[in-house]
Regions:
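An amphipathic, aromatic/His-enriched active-site/gating alpha helix that lines ligand/cofactor pockets
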Residues: 30-41, 60-97
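A conserved mid-domain beta-alpha-beta active-site/ligand-binding segment of alpha/beta enzyme cores
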Residues: 99-104
Length: 107
């Protein structure tokens, strides 16, 4: 099983909006099902820092990069608008650069 992790900013003043979305996502079985359909187990962490807030996303599965690409391609328009407003992520601009594994204590 492979894993991929990435970090995205929560733009200034948008943390409460993000928290509200997370509350909705937790109640929506279709959201989790979309991740299963993409072949990944997604986890989302909130990282609060003195320099701003971030989310850390992990995708675990046979091919997390392909799963992430599928999630991006099938993102509902309202969620795409949310990602743009809260994270500055334009899902129509193509995928962001994929993260590079810098250290693995078991490798």
């Amino acid at each position: 099983m492979a894993i991929m992790a990435m970090c995205m900013p929560i733009l200034p003043g948008k943390k409460d909006m993000w928290k509200g979305m997370i509350d909705e996502v937790k109640k929506d079985p279709n959201f989790a099902a979309s991740r299963e359909a993409a072949g990944v187990h997604e986890r989302t962490f909130l990282q609060e820092t003195p320099h701003g807030d971030f989310i850390i996303l992990t995708y675990e599965g046979e091919n997390p990069e392909a799963g992430f690409a599928q999630i991006m391609a099938n993102m509902p328009p309202e969620f795409a608008a949310f990602a743009k407003e809260v994270h500055g992520l334009d899902v129509n601009a193509g995928p962001p650069p994929m993260p590079t594994l810098a250290f693995d204590s078991r490798a």
